[in-house]
């Protein structure tokens, strides 16, 4: 059951652009030189979040596996699944010109039965260039079983570029930096 939840979360993340669809699933196997050429270029001025050493591993009973190209980032109090290259690419653009991203957050002890709309607050600031702050929607709890609930939150970014995103829930705060590109 734990694997089922992990798979569903990953499929949802892929559908919203949080995680890349593996190149081998798109068009056969890709050689390493071709893969390097396809990797997005992040400007040195954007300090994207890199995989930590040692890697963060979610506490049991939460899933600890990821797909290639992704990593768990955070602490037992609040964590998220990010891309290892620090980018969000190909986000849908809404009629108002903003770029939509759906985020999935985990908090040890979060109980969906007690809080359907958890008070997760997500803020964001563009680094290096002025832009209005991101818009954050209402957070929702979600799960496919009683042991692994997580929190979803949709954000709208008013511009492409380098963004510092911060989530706050209960007594936890987690920030990361991403390069948002077309």
Residue ranges of model-derived segments:
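Bacterial N-terminal signal peptides
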Residues: 7-18
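Contiguous segments within soluble domain cores/interaction surfaces
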Residues: 28-158, 162-182
């Amino acid at each position: 059951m734990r694997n089922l939840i992990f798979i569903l979360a990953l499929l949802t993340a892929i559908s919203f652009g949080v995680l890349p669809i593996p190149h081998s699933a798109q068009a056969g196997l890709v050689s390493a030189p071709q893969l390097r050429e396809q990797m997005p270029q992040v400007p040195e001025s954007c300090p994207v979040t890199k995989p930590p050493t040692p890697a963060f591993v979610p506490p049991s009973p939460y899933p600890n596996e990821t797909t290639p190209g992704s990593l768990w980032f955070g602490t037992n109090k609040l964590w998220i699944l990010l891309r290892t290259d620090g980018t969000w690419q190909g986000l849908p653009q809404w009629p108002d010109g903003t770029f939509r991203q759906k985020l999935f957050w985990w908090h040890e002890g979060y109980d969906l039965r007690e809080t359907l709309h958890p008070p997760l607050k997500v803020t964001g600031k563009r680094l290096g260039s002025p832009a209005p702050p991101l818009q954050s929607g209402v957070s929702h709890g979600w799960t496919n079983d009683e042991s692994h609930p997580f929190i979803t939150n949709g954000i709208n970014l008013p511009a492409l570029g380098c963004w510092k995103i911060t989530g706050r829930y209960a007594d936890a705060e987690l920030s990361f930096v991403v390069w948002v590109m077309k």
